[in-house]
């Protein structure tokens, strides 16, 4: 059985669309949800099978492409499409 996994990412408002397009380009690895556009907070929901790949993509965007994408929280999906609730 597949388990869902999520990342809460701090970005800039102007980087959200690019992050979304990159994740979408890798069809099926995750779904991007904007939590707070003005604050630049997005949530990427993936699976345990793809979590390492998604983490690598996010870190690569942050380090090599001038995109602010800092993972502030990650773990098993808590069941919300909009925010990573504790």
Identify what each model region corresponds to.
Residues 11-56:
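Amphipathic, hydrophobic secondary-structure cores in small proteins
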Residues 50-86:
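C-terminal structural segments of small proteins and small subunits
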Residues 1-11:
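Short glycine-/aliphatic-rich beta-strand segments at the starts of folded cytosolic domains
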Residues 7-9, 20, 28, 67, ...:
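Intrinsically disordered, low-complexity regions enriched in small/polar residues
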Residues 6, 14, 24-27, 59, ...:
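Glutamate identity and glutamate-enriched acidic tracts
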Residues 2, 25, 37, 62-64:
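A generic structural signal for short, non-catalytic loop/turn and secondary-structure boundary residues
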